[in-house]
A protein has these predicted regions:
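Hydrophobic residues at beta-strand termini and immediately following loops
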Residues: 1, 124
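C-terminal "cap" of GNAT-fold acetyltransferases
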Residues: 99-102, 106-113, 118-119, 125-147
């Protein structure tokens, strides 16, 4: 993702949970989104000519990729974009023979947890104090059948 795209998205993403609740600054989010990591590429999510959000995939994690970041801007939420991203995430994993898909979501982010569970992810662990002291993250896993 380009620095310009990251800087455009970051202030908007910083105003929605979980980043708002965790007090992530636009500068911190922009730095994360613009970072160049070969094993964790960042992508802008486009809808037509508009940028609707961002996604980061950590490719090699526990026999499958980890969806490290998924942020959809409010005007684009509840339109199937997140589902399309999850379908893409799964198809990319299947292409490389991954056995698992991994996601973590904040315990308070009930809407995200419900979304992931509707897409076949199951809760496998509670990670206390991972991001912020006193909060928990829920690790979710989706097993992919071997072909």
């Amino acid at each position: 993702m380009s620095r310009a795209t990251a800087e455009m998205l970051a202030p908007q993403l910083a105003n929605i949970d979980p980043w708002a609740r965790y007090n992530y600054t636009p500068a911190a989010l922009a730095s994360f989104l613009a970072a160049g990591e070969a094993d964790a590429p960042r992508y802008a999510i486009a809808v037509g000519r508009a940028i609707a959000g961002a996604v980061c995939i950590r490719k090699n994690w526990l026999r499958g990729p980890y969806l490290q970041f998924l942020g959809i801007l409010p005007p684009y939420q509840s339109q199937g974009i997140g589902s399309s991203v999850l379908n893409w995430f799964e198809s990319q994993a299947r292409e490389v023979g991954a056995q698992n898909l991994w996601i973590a979501a904040s315990e308070f982010n009930v809407r995200a947890l419900s979304f992931y569970e509707r897409h076949g992810y199951g809760r496998v662990a509670v990670l206390t104090d991972l991001v912020v002291e006193g909060s928990s993250e829920i690790l979710l896993r989706k097993r992919l059948p071997r072909c």
